[in-house]
């Protein structure tokens, strides 16, 4: 089959602090963080990716949390392998910066013919990752009343680590559009 893996999430401003926010009547405004989470189905298999940008000039706090989430996402993606509990590295980076309470979901999930499959890549997850699995790596920081940042890639777990499957650019600094 083909189509979309799930209803896309497009959330801006304070609504970007809702990890699974859906479209609303809120207009996208200058200065807003804008989170876009989307996926497609190709040949029966799902995909999932998220990027966060800023509409216009970014507030210093938006830059701070983007930089933090970016560092956590890259570190976890680089370290993930069948023996490693990847959630811990991202969670530690975010917690050490004082935002641990604002990373309220697991690091990721399996993706296959369904958008959310085992394994859970989370401190709540059971068991280890296995070579051949496809998982997401999607840390986030969500500040109620301000906004949120999530960066998500899909990874193929190998014997020695992971190969990033997502081809969409992931800027090291918050992109102002």
PLM regions and their residue ranges:
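Active-site neighborhoods and metal-handling regions in enzymes and metal-associated proteins
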Residues: 1-177
